[in-house]
């Protein structure tokens, strides 16, 4: 039996899909599952990330929340869930829903159906201005593990100016990421590296496997790189980088 979920964005007026549980981005007073975040810390300048990057970020947030909300033990085989996710999407993304659904099937081992609805993507959750006179040449994901640390060091040793992007949902992980980023700043200088730590938390989280977290990390990195123009590269120094 499939479970229907509806991701609602701030300011959206339409009614949710029938019988669908709602997930929302902290809409005040909403009777639904709140996804807590500080996405307003993400950059809206020098350039506002385009609708494709913002749409992908919203989709990744919805997928990650659904992955956390629905316990695998409730599935018929205690693993493979049937998930129907209704989500806001800019027009270019609507045609990609079948391809993204197949990607998610492979990534999480579930049966996904994405139901995009055409709506304007309010950029209001991306608000921060870039605080430095210099601009980065690259963005790198920075989980705080050894691979991401070595990847950042490799890029800095190559002379690049860098934004390292972290995601956390509890304080201990945030402190590890902040401590490592501070060490990079001390060694290479504050004009070479900037750390962007983004909090995304979902209090309703009975499921712990979370295979979709890599998609959310990728979406956060893409939205960050998009704020600095098409020439800004995104690096993913994870899972084996240190062995290269």
Q: How should each PLM-predicted stretch be described?
A:
Residues 197-202, 238-241:
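Short, small-residue-rich loop/turn micro-motifs
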Residues 202-207, 244:
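Active-site-proximal beta-alpha loop/turn segments in soluble metabolic enzymes
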Residues 141-142, 244:
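Basic/polar, acidic-poor N-terminal "presequence/leader" segments
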Residues 1-139, 149-199, 206:
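RNA-binding accessory domains that recognize and position tRNA/RNA substrates
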Residues 145:
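Conserved G/P- and acidic residue-centered "switch" motifs that form tight phosphate/ATP-binding loops
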Residues 210-244:
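Active-site adenylate/phosphate-handling loop in enzymes that bind or generate adenylated species
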């Amino acid at each position: 039996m499939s479970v229907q979920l509806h991701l609602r964005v701030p300011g959206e007026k339409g009614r949710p899909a029938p019988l669908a549980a709602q997930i929302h981005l902290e809409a005040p007073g909403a009777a639904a599952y709140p996804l807590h975040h500080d996405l307003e810390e993400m950059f809206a300048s020098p350039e506002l990330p385009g609708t494709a990057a913002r749409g992908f970020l919203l989709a990744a947030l919805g997928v990650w929340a659904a992955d956390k909300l629905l316990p695998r033990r409730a599935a018929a085989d205690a693993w493979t869930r049937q998930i129907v996710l209704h989500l806001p999407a800019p027009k270019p993304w609507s045609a990609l829903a079948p391809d993204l659904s197949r990607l998610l099937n492979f990534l999480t081992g579930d049966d996904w159906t994405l139901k995009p609805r055409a709506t304007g993507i309010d950029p209001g959750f991306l608000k921060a201005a870039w605080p430095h006179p210099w601009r980065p040449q690259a963005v790198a994901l920075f989980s705080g593990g050894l691979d991401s640390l070595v990847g950042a060091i490799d890029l800095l040793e190559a002379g690049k100016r860098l934004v390292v992007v972290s995601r956390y949902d509890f304080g201990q992980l945030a402190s590890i990421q902040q401590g490592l980023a501070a060490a990079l700043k001390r060694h290479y200088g504050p004009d070479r590296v900037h750390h962007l730590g983004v909090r995304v938390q979902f209090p309703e989280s009975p499921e712990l496997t979370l295979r979709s977290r890599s998609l959310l990390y990728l979406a956060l990195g893409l939205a960050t790189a998009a704020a600095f123009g098409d020439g800004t590269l995104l690096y993913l120094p994870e899972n084996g980088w240190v062995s290269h």
